[in-house]
UniProtKB/Swiss-Prot annotation:
Organism: Clostridium novyi (strain NT)
InterPro entries linked: Aldolase_TIM (IPR013785), His_biosynth (IPR006062), HisA_bact_arch (IPR006063), Isoase_HisA-like (IPR044524), Isoase_HisA-like_bact (IPR023016), RibuloseP-bd_barrel (IPR011060)
EC number from the UniProt entry: 5.3.1.16
Protein name per UniProt: 1-(5-phosphoribosyl)-5-[(5-phosphoribosylamino)methylideneamino] imidazole-4-carboxamide isomerase
A GO MF term: 1-(5-phosphoribosyl)-5-[(5-phosphoribosylamino)methylideneamino]imidazole-4-carboxamide isomerase activity
One cellular component (GO) term of this entry: cytoplasm
Pfam families: His_biosynth
């Protein structure tokens, strides 16, 4: 299992949200580049980055920071937030993003997912952000009537190999992941599943590893010192 430390960008700074609420934003670091360098020093092999401004506006807002980070940190990153067209995907892959994450666009534009998969195969992941079992879109502001399992099956059927699952009600809470929802997802699809939202300590990491989950995205637990990143990475590699 791999540990992906998380950087959420808002107005150029690293922030954390609470349950996806943009009115409950906490700045956790001024510099995304310095934060990423710290993650790399701790042994991170991959970093998860979300452009929250982009997710809200439907277009990349913090791409200059992403570009700088790729040049200075030299570590694989997966990036999502505001990716709505193939031109943006082409640009991100071109500047060195290792994996792009489609969220809202995946639900609203299946044709885009198919084209992205055709061009970039497993460099494309679909982020499924769910609340009460239903997929949320537009920066988590709107809840669809699409069940998260049905959506995951659909994405797998068109060639998606990587699914990032977030339970919005757990995000930023340090209450632990939604293990039941993750297990149900794992029982229904064969994609690589990355768990996100609520991971609070190394016990959660151990349990996810027991579930044979592909990856764990850890954010608030690192910034609040609940998890020692070096320790979590060593644990995940055992």
């Amino acid at each position: 299992m791999i540990i992906l430390p998380a950087i959420d960008l808002r107005m150029g700074k690293c922030v954390r949200l609470y349950k996806g609420d943009f009115n409950k934003t906490e700045i956790v670091a001024e510099s995304a580049v310095d934060t990423a360098l710290m993650f790399k020093e701790c042994g991170a092999e991959y970093i998860h980055i979300v452009d929250l401004d982009g997710a809200l506006k439907g277009k990349g807002i913090n791409l200059d920071i992403v570009c700088e980070l790729i040049k200075k940190v030299d570590i694989p990153i997966e990036f999502g937030g505001g990716i709505r067209d193939i031109e943006t995907i082409d640009y991100l892959i071109d500047i060195g993003v290792s994996r792009i994450i489609l969220g809202t666009a995946a639900l609203n534009n299946e044709k885009l997912v198919r084209e992205a998969i055709k061009r970039y195969d497993d460099k494309v992941a679909v982020g499924i952000d769910a609340k009460n079992g239903y997929v949320a879109v537009e920066g988590w502001l709107n809840l669809s009537n699409v069940n998260y399992i049905d959506f995951a099956k659909k994405m797998e059927s068109i060639g998606v190999k990587n699914i990032i699952f977030t339970d919005i009600s757990r995000d930023g809470t340090l209450n632990g992941p939604n293990f039941d929802a993750l297990l149900k997802l794992k029982e229904n699809i064969n994609c690589n599943i990355t768990a996100s939202g609520g991971i609070k300590d190394v016990n959660d990491i151990k349990k996810l590893k027991e579930f044979n989950i592909y990856g764990a995205i850890v954010g608030k637990a690192i910034y609040s010192n609940n998890i020692d990143l070096k320790e979590a990475i060593k644990l995940s590699e055992k």
